[in-house]
């Protein structure tokens, strides 16, 4: 098991069922050292208000030896790469994930989807693109992976895509992993948990990575320090409370 999980939702996204405290308790049981709460951005119908994200600054950094990153799974809004995260939200958040979600950006043709994703990557506002292997959104995988490597943005392999959602993602995700490997980029693993019980589960992700001989040294979840080094390379100030994770 890797000790870092970068994608999960709480009851603040009302189609999810666990609290921050639930995730902390589960992290202690499973040996997770660092995790990110990434509730849906406010343009989603059941997402929290933008004040929710601004007020995450009151969260403790570490509880019972478990580090907590303040994050969001923002929505890509248009071909210009705009996302539903702005202003004071950026000041409170450590980790910005962004991806396509049908209620905000409906599936388009391959060229349009690719343009929107690359513009989001190039914006400098995001750290990870969520579930880029979603078969509903055809993209130029090679072009996206090369843009992500250039701009130091990780592409996610999402465990939920192989279990509960985005049916038919396997082939696309293998292609994404292979393209990231060839481009020398980063992969992030996300459980995409909507209940704490699936936190840290990456078994299906690892099957995808193994199938393409993906290099472990390019997986962000291998250690808290690797993930923090990545975020600091993107401009995040070092967080003193995480020094001993």
Curated annotation (Swiss-Prot):
Subunit structure: Homotrimer.
EC number from the UniProt entry: 3.1.3.-
Annotated cofactor note: Binds 3 Zn(2+) ions per subunit.
Cofactor: Zn(2+)
Pfam families noted in UniProt: PHP
Positions of disulphide bridges: none
InterPro entries per UniProt: Phosphatase_YcdX_put, PHP_dom, PHP_phosphatase, Pol/His_phosphatase_N, Pol/histidinol_Pase-like
Entry GO CC: cytosol
Species for this entry: Escherichia coli O1:K1 / APEC
Binding site for Zn(2+) 2: 15, 40, 194
Protein name in UniProt: Probable phosphatase YcdX
Keywords from the UniProt entry: Hydrolase, Metal-binding, Zinc
Entry's family note: Belongs to the PHP family.
UniProt-annotated binding residues for Zn(2+) 3: 73, 101, 131
Binding site for Zn(2+) 1: 7, 9, 73, 192
GO biological process: bacterial-type flagellum-dependent swarming motility
Listed GO MF terms: phosphatase activity; zinc ion binding
